[in-house]
Amino acid sequence: MNANPKFLSADARVDAAAVAPLPNSRKVYVTGSQPDIRVPMREITQADTPTSFGGEKNPPIYVYDTSGPYTDPDAKIDIRAGLPALRQRWIDARGDTETLAGLTSEYGRERAADPATAELRFPDLHRHPRRAKAGRNVTQMHYARQGIITPEMEFIAIRENQRRAEYLESLKASGPNGAKLAAMMGRQHAGQAFGAAAFGANEAGTNMLTEITPEFVRSEVACGRAIIPANINHPETEPMIIGRNFLVKINANIGNSAVTSSIGEEVDKMTWAIRWGGDTVMDLSTGKHIHETREWIIRNSPVPIGTVPIYQALEKVNGKAEDLTWEIFRDTLIEQAEQGVDYFTIHAGVRLQYVPLTANRMTGIVSRGGSIMAKWCLAHHKESFLYEHFEEICEIMKAYDVSFSLGDGLRPGSIYDANDEAQLGELKTLGELTQIAWKHDVQVMIEGPGHVPMQLIKENMDLQLDWCKEAPFYTLGPLTTDIAPGYDHITSGIGAAMIGWFGTAMLCYVTPKEHLGLPNKDDVKEGIITYKLAAHAADLAKGHPGAQVRDNALSKARFEFRWEDQFNLGLDPDKAREFHDETLPKDSAKVAHFCSMCGPHFCSMKITQDVREFAAQQGMSEDDALKKGMEVKAVEFVKTGSEIYHRQ
């Protein structure tokens, strides 16, 4: 199925499921130093602790929210108009950009003038593209290196902290046991951060960073250890950061192909992905109407959008890689930069000398972009135009603040090929290209594998940190085994959690359809939830400040049999509630002190609570209560004849 013009021109509507607030949640905004710095978060309301457990108040939990205005009941959502230009005033105030009279890319102008695409196009070019003024650099890295803290950096600092300090203060004020409760709920295991600066040199917990400040954000961007993907032509985006010293982020891939999916379906996938926690979205469309699909997605996306420009360039030469030219690729970069793409995957590290190294692989070259460039190199027997024109690409990137995502075109497609000479040779080249981009103050992250068994994952991370000078690592998984088609979200989730712990800044999700087909909405959600789990597990393992707050809150709710809070504090409240209700559907089961796993008589948490209640009644400690209970049972055993078994 391809795009439906009538649907897009007249009847485009947002997916109703994507705009419904999550249970017991509401959108809140934290205001920064100026009124238009309004940082969104999701507030999850909790019930009071039952009287039998002390009856204290449980204040709301605040969690990172990527859903943009879509889950705000007060927002007016019309995907035909796009989202509000959140960052426009900040961009204007810097005075270093100019508004263009219209599109400057040749292909962009052709599409705008083509009557055949009129009904497909996003309604009107309501915001003319912008570009840096002559001689100016508009990247967040450039500002950071000038010592400037931008509104984007302040926004990010507030967002990363998730109102953790306010939450702990609200616990302290909750009653006579408030201080004790705050200490309990704020407790966190010391992490092992493998040298990440935000977590201090001492893994025992001293000298740890306890709060993300705007200055810390600036310093991390300035040194290249983090990036803020925020094209000046995507003012709708809510600023976020990708770096090993911040919360681990996840990316969701969407995009049509030549045989399936429409523009409307891809917009729905985007809104669905960000509802469940996608921090960025990559549009990997390879079918018809790539330009129009991307415009609809960007104008309606509150998260950064990434692309692989070589895919569209290939479409322009009818799929013949050898016919690609620098001029076609350059025009494609400008076309997409003017639309507002925030980061480009560019496979400039695929060099002619590395291609023969893949000959003895089990699975050869599995990256689409990598195979395109390898074919071009062999056809022309020269270095790729991406490598030869890299400095010119940097000039384009810094005129729009597009970040590099330097592609791993020679990543392993099987664990057999992991960490081979081709993969590592390309990685070393990516480190060299990073230094060139940084000379231009262009932001860079590095893409990584792929398929890697667990014992080789840390080597990947260590080499990347060394050769790429701590530029953020962005990995696809890695998949830790090749035996589970249909379950590769799990095989890769294992590797993702590990490499996130070791220092990867962003994890590219894998869905159950990996290697099998184009994912639908259900697959997108499954991949997102799996990777949110992996990212959170990595944050916990690193000891990221406040990472354990949500775990502690859910564990407390579980022990107190606050079922609704258990559902709502989880990553997927809908599935948790569905599983519980399969066996205990009645409302009365939502307050029961057991579930269907153990039943009312064998619930370990209920037994623990009975011991505590007995101890309180007897005026003794829990240890003494357990000892007393054992003595009583011993007397009963002797009185009944010291028989292990009794007939009923």
Swiss-Prot record:
Pathway: Cofactor biosynthesis; thiamine diphosphate biosynthesis. Zn(2+) binds at H451, H515. Its cofactor is [4Fe-4S] cluster. It catalyses: 5-amino-1-(5-phospho-beta-D-ribosyl)imidazole + S-adenosyl-L-methionine = 4-amino-2-methyl-5-(phosphooxymethyl)pyrimidine + CO + 5'-deoxyadenosine + formate + L-methionine + 3 H(+). Binds 1 [4Fe-4S] cluster per subunit. The cluster is coordinated with 3 cysteines and an exchangeable S-adenosyl-L-methionine. One of its GO terms (biological process) is thiamine diphosphate biosynthetic process. Keywords: 4Fe-4S, Iron, Iron-sulfur, Lyase, Metal-binding, S-adenosyl-L-methionine, Thiamine biosynthesis, Zinc. The keyword Nucleus does not apply. [4Fe-4S] cluster binds at C595, C598, C603. It comes from the Bacteria. Pfam families: ThiC-associated (PF13667), ThiC_Rad_SAM (PF01964). GO terms for cellular component: cytosol. Its EC number is 4.1.99.17. Substrate binds at N253, M282, Y311, H347, S367, R368, G369, D408, G409, L410, R411, E447, Y474. Coiled coil: none annotated. GO terms for molecular function: 4 iron, 4 sulfur cluster binding; carbon-carbon lyase activity; zinc ion binding. Catalyzes the synthesis of the hydroxymethylpyrimidine phosphate (HMP-P) moiety of thiamine from aminoimidazole ribotide (AIR) in a radical S-adenosyl-L-methionine (SAM)-dependent reaction. Homodimer. Belongs to the ThiC family. HAMAP family: ThiC (MF_00089). This is Phosphomethylpyrimidine synthase. It comes from Burkholderia thailandensis (strain ATCC 700388 / DSM 13276 / CCUG 48851 / CIP 106301 / E264). The gene is thiC.
